[in-house]
Amino acid sequence: MTERRPVLAVIGAGPAGLAAALAASARGVRVVLVDSAAEPGGQFYRQPAPGLGARRPQALHHHWRTWVRLRNGLAAHVTAGRVTHLSEHHVWCVERESAGFVVHALLGSEQREPTAVRADGVVLATGGYEQVWPFPGWTLPGVITAGGAQALLKGGLTLPGRTVVVAGTGPLLLPVATGLAAAGAHVTALVESAAPTTLVRRPANPRDAVRGVRALAAQPGKLAEAAGYVAQLLRHRVSVMVRQAAVEAHGRDRLESVTVAALDPEGRPVPGTAQRLACDTLAVGHGLLPHTDLADGLGCRLDGAGVRVDDEQRTDVPGVWAAGEATGIGGAALSLAEGHIAGRSAAARLHGTEPDPRAWAPAARNRARLRAFFAEVERAYAAPVRWAEDVTDATVVCRCEEVTAGAVREAVDSLGAGDLRTVKLLTRAGMGWCQGRMCEPGVAGVAGCDLTPGRRPLARPVPLGVLAAPPPPDSGPNP
């Protein structure tokens, strides 16, 4: 009688999930890779649909060789039966049982067919999602997220518009602006509310200065990549507007122009600096936040916005690991390092052995360097202190329930709301289809509340029929 091999469920097929799946399956663990997309890769390695006949998909990507290695490795493990890849499976709950875990998902674009995966351990590689701070006109057709514009280009080979302004804050704006320009869009301007020069500006504390210089010097490749983006912006004649912000979008039936203005040190528009830019598309984003819905449901402790993990990428819930953007925003290379460590640790512990950290020492060193680098990046792209003060009362902050900033302020000032949950109960902000994923950062900013995750048993909307039905059969690997 053959010995039963342990099963590891990896949720998310982006860089972290792929790295974890490959590392674990190479060490004798049966892996079930569950992902909502039709193809693996996540947002970073998003590929055009096969039917589009892309001739040079590598032109839309950095680190193409790494992607080819991951793609081919996954295909080999799937063919060998070591990995079961469940694509287009939308996970809505991970349930703890005495013998392990059950991953509940909905299959397909309709998200109505239930499926379940039983596993001995779970790796949460759920990635991150984009945040957008509300401003007047941001609900107009033609205003999209920066990540959405990039997804259209990478996955659909489609430009969101002909004349584009890219605005907001964060490193993501650089590849979005350069990618759109290279694909043929007229990118009028890249409007960055932060001052990236703070990356090299000397902090008041000498120790912070030394630490920052070391973190930057340890990543020459990242600095060279940024320089390459700047060169592309110059080549495509994209106007770069630093310490400025999109303060209002204009149009009748759809976007026609956007007003940008310079910001003072606290993030307020400087009077007399506003200018109007004609465009049919505004791609806007204000950084990323970790996806922690499933971790919250499992009871995993958070560290700031991300899932807290130890040196092995273990959470404080036994049998659960987390890797990639779910633990904090840090890019694809950091996700790969964390995923590799999580996969190796999970494989050892599910086999009942103690992991040897020396086996993943190179990945751990890379992880440490990249975490230090992105700590400096986070400092440079910190949100302006007073951005919410200029959100007008008439501005919709919760799209699903059409709640305005004025209603949120009334809940705080007149009704005594002091946290997001109370604001939600009084205004319905966050009660819609997105369950606050899109609006919570904006509502929190307008309300002056901390952005605290709301623990929910379900990570996404689920039909009542699915909840009432008998448990579905196990969709994991055969014994």
Where are these regions (language model features)?
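Beta1/beta-strand and adjacent pyrophosphate-binding region of the FAD-binding site
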Residues: 2-16, 162-170
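Core beta-strand elements of the Rossmann-like FAD/NAD(P) dinucleotide-binding domain
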Residues: 4-6, 111-121, 270-280, 316
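Beta1-alpha1 glycine-rich phosphate/pyrophosphate-binding loop at the start
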Residues: 6-69, 177-220
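Short hydrophobic core segments
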Residues: 11, 34, 116-127, 278-286
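A Rossmann-like FAD-binding core segment of flavoenzymes
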Residues: 69, 74-105, 183-286, 290-291
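Glycine-rich dinucleotide-binding loop and its adjacent helix/turn
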Residues: 128-165, 170-176, 304-312
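FAD-site-proximal beta/loop scaffold in flavoenzymes
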Residues: 145-153, 265, 269, 281-330
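A conserved FAD-binding loop/helix module that cradles the flavin
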Residues: 323-354, 358-362
